[in-house]
């Protein structure tokens, strides 16, 4: 038998109708995750066409994008002030009730960011196909699943048929080797990959991350890597399942139990790429040479080492890249050749589906413990789910954040996309652990530096872009 990649195995196992020269493939979807922003039109289409949800048992909804993260009132209820957000949340509740879809609503102990709750509930499993009306669905690929975002019309199609029309993408091995230096995290790995190879490197491909560095990462670190595959242009990102994967899934609410668990693990062990399998393209990264990373522009590919300098137009041979740099620096009010270390900041956001899990909060709290954030800096700490929040509070992490002067908020997408009052004011600078730094992403006129939780905390302490390595061990 011809050796196959991880992607090949998962794709081939889900073909309902093979791809031909004239038509794309039809593939079966194992898990469909939905939220309040990209699903309303899909449900409207179902009603108009008299259709039902084919597999409500393979569908799960949560509220995350529009949910306020404001602390609960005296009555224990999270207040929803924004009228549009309230309407979206009500609509999702009505849609799920009508079509029989389980929902983790605002106020549920399991509510949270869709790409946080899937893994923590044990819904995300190796070998699955997983879709959601959200581009960062690639997060679930950390488990050896084929997971990607879909559009609203495709959401309707999956709800009605549990299938999806797709053209088979190519494969790209992203090999990462070398031991990480202190202060360098999974977030720095993915920012470095995107900075080196560009936001279009993965166009038409699925990334498979391999190498000793990837194998040494925890599951939550692997999720950070796969989360930003889309920022590298890829359709999805995958990491082969191993014992680290199985240990993470074991015992979670929706994980297989008993004999079914043994059978599942036996199958999952067959998924890693076969020796001799051929990728369409291979790129590499020496992780031992990495330092903490930070972005300086208006796409995630505009990144550099924390102690570096913004490139000059002369360093960019491509005219389009020079034009993009000029436009980005005008928006960011920065100069070519300028260092970012010491650049004043106004906001720090610790959260998003990239970096809001318990390990991220632990990492940040360790660095912040016994310290204060700088005067004039607003720091928002937003756990990725109610379960993460509960665990963090059980460990006393929230008290560390509050004692330092940070806001401890409820679970949700929050400032990643500038929802409700979780915004960066116009013209102000934020160090953010999220995944996108587009113009206006965190609020009209907001200027975003993407970085790791460690860099975010160090910057909050200094009130300026800071290198976290100076705080390690102290």
UniProtKB/Swiss-Prot annotation:
Cofactor(s) it depends on: [4Fe-4S] cluster
The organism's taxonomic lineage, starting at the top: Bacteria, Bacillati, Chloroflexota, Chloroflexia, Chloroflexales
Q: What is its EC number?
A: 4.2.1.33
Q: How does it assemble?
A: Heterodimer of LeuC and LeuD.
Species: Roseiflexus sp. (strain RS-1)
Which molecular-function annotations from GO does this UniProt entry contain? 3-isopropylmalate dehydratase activity; 4 iron, 4 sulfur cluster binding; metal ion binding
Protein purpose? Catalyzes the isomerization between 2-isopropylmalate and 3-isopropylmalate, via the formation of 2-isopropylmaleate.
Identify the residues that bind [4Fe-4S] cluster: 353, 413, 416
Entry keywords, A to Z: 4Fe-4S, Amino-acid biosynthesis, Branched-chain amino acid biosynthesis, Iron, Iron-sulfur, Leucine biosynthesis, Lyase, Metal-binding
Q: Does the keyword Metal-binding apply?
A: yes
Catalyses which reaction?
(2R,3S)-3-isopropylmalate = (2S)-2-isopropylmalate
Q: Tell me the superkingdom of the source.
A: Bacteria
Instruction: Using the UniProt record, name the top-level EC class of this enzyme in a single word.
Output: lyase
**InterPro entries membership:** 3-IsopropMal_deHydase_lsu, Acnase/IPM_dHydase_lsu_aba_1/3, Acoase/IPM_deHydtase_lsu_aba, Aconitase_4Fe-4S_BS, Aconitase_4Fe-4S_dom, IPM_dehydratase_rel_enz, IPMI_cat
Pathway terms, separated by semicolons? Amino-acid biosynthesis; L-leucine biosynthesis; L-leucine from 3-methyl-2-oxobutanoate: step 2/4
> Keyword Isomerase, does the record have it?
no
Instruction: Recite the UniProt cofactor note for this protein.
Output: Binds 1 [4Fe-4S] cluster per subunit.
Q: Which family is this sequence assigned to?
A: Belongs to the aconitase/IPM isomerase family. LeuC type 1 subfamily.
Protein name as annotated? 3-isopropylmalate dehydratase large subunit
Output the GO biological process annotations, alphabetical, semicolon-separated.
Answer: L-leucine biosynthetic process
């Amino acid at each position: 038998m011809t050796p196959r990649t991880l992607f090949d195995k998962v794709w081939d196992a889900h073909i309902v109708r093979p791809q031909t020269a004239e038509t794309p493939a039809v593939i079966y979807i194992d898990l469909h995750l939905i939220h309040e922003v990209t699903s309303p039109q899909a449900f409207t289409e179902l009603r108009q066409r008299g259709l039902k949800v084919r597999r409500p048992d393979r569908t799960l909804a949560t509220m995350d994008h529009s949910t306020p993260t404001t602390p609960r009132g005296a009555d224990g209820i999270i207040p929803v002030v924004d009228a549009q957000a309230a309407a979206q949340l009500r609509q999702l509740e009505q849609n799920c009730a009508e079509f029989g879809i389980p929902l983790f609503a605002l106020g549920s102990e399991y509510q949270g960011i869709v790409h946080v709750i899937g893994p923590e509930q044990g819904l995300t499993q190796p070998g699955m196909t997983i879709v959601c009306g959200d581009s960062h669905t690639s997060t679930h690929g950390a488990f050896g699943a084929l997971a990607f975002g879909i559009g609203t019309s495709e959401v309707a199609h999956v709800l009605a048929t549990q299938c999806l029309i797709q053209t088979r993408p190519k494969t790209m091995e992203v090999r990462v080797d070398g031991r990480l230096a202190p202060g360098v995290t999974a977030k720095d790995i993915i920012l470095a990959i995107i900075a080196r190879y560009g936001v279009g490197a993965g166009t038409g491909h699925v990334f498979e991350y391999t190498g000793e560095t990837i194998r040494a990462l925890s599951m939550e670190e692997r999720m950070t890597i796969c989360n930003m595959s889309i920022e590298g242009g890829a359709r999805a990102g995958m990491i082969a399942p191993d014992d680290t994967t199985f240990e993470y899934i074991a015992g979670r609410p929706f994980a297989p139990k008993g004999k079914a668990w043994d059978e599942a693990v036996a199958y999952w062990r067959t998924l890693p790429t076969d020796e001799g399998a051929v990728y369409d393209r291979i790129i590499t990264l020496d992780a031992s040479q990495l330092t903490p990373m930070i972005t300086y522009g208006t796409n995630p590919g505009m990144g550099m080492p924390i102690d570096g300098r913004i490139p000059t137009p002369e360093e960019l041979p491509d005219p389009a890249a020079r034009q993009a740099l000029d436009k980005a620096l005008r928006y960011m009010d920065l100069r070519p050749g300028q260092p970012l270390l010491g650049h004043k900041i106004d906001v720090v956001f610790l959260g998003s589906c990239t970096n809001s899990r318990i390990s991220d909060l632990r990492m940040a709290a360790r660095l912040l413990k016994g310290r204060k954030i700088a005067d004039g800096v607003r720091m928002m700490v937003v756990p990725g789910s109610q379960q993460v929040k509960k665990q963090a509070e059980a460990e006393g992490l929230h008290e560390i954040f509050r004692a330092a002067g940070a806001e401890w908020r409820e679970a949700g997408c929050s400032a990643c996309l500038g929802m409700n009052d979780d915004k960066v004011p116009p013209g102000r600078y934020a160090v953010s652990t999220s995944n996108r730094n587009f113009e206006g992403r965190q609020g009209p006129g907001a200027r975003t530096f993407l970085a790791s939780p460690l860099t975010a905390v160090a910057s909050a302490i200094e009130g300026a872009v800071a290198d976290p390595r100076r705080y390690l061990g102290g």
